């Protein structure tokens, strides 16, 4: 007999939305203030395949899907947004979170920049 584990639904009013936008995909994670993950989605998980995952529309749909799910399940009202990565869908994902009737307290860019670290890969020759 198999055992089914269900996550307890808990009321989380304040949370953090992490948006990681790369050149190929976008990953949106919604956590509570302690860092416990409530939902994690990507553009590929929302049905986008190939080069369509890197579009601003895919970022908008992924962010709105994640936030709407958390609002329905946990009753979230206030979020702070942390964005990282150089991807194309950064601004559209932020706008999608703001459009979900949430109180956005802060927007922070947490992209890591090297202080002249490793040598970059060479230019592609086709």
Swiss-Prot record:
Q: Which GO terms describe its molecular function?
A: rRNA binding; structural constituent of ribosome
Asked whether the UniProt record includes RNA-binding among its keywords, one would answer yes
Q: Which GO terms describe its cellular component?
A: ribonucleoprotein complex; ribosome
Q: Name one Pfam family in it.
A: Ribosomal_S11
Q: Determine if Transcription is one of this entry's keywords.
A: no
GO biological process: one example:
translation
SUPFAM superfamilies associated with the record: Translational machinery components
List the InterPro entries: Ribosomal_uS11 (IPR001971), Ribosomal_uS11_bac-type (IPR019981), Ribosomal_uS11_sf (IPR036967)
Keyword list, A-Z = Ribonucleoprotein, Ribosomal protein, RNA-binding, rRNA-binding
Domain of life of the native organism: Bacteria
Q: What does this protein do?
A: Located on the platform of the 30S subunit, it bridges several disparate RNA helices of the 16S rRNA. Forms part of the Shine-Dalgarno cleft in the 70S ribosome.
Database matches in NCBIfam families:
PRK05309.1, uS11_bact
What is the annotated quaternary arrangement, including any partners? Part of the 30S ribosomal subunit. Interacts with proteins S7 and S18. Binds to IF-3.
- Identify its protein family: Belongs to the universal ribosomal protein uS11 family.
* Alphabetized PANTHER family for the sequence: 40S RIBOSOMAL PROTEIN S14/30S RIBOSOMAL PROTEIN S11
This protein's name: Small ribosomal subunit protein uS11
């Amino acid at each position: 007999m198999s055992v089914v584990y269900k996550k307890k639904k808990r009321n989380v009013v304040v949370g953090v939305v992490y948006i990681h936008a790369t050149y190929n995909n976008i990953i949106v994670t919604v956590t509570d203030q302690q860092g416990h993950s409530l939902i994690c989605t990507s553009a590929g998980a929302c049905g986008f395949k190939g080069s369509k995952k890197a579009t601003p529309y895919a970022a908008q749909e992924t962010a709105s899907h994640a936030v709407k799910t958390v609002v329905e399940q946990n009753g979230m009202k206030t979020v702070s947004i942390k964005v990282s990565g150089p991807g194309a869908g950064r601004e559209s994902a932020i706008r999608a979170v703001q459009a979900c009737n949430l109180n956005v307290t802060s927007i922070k860019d947490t992209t890591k920049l090297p202080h002249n670290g490793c040598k970059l890969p060479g230019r592609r020759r086709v």
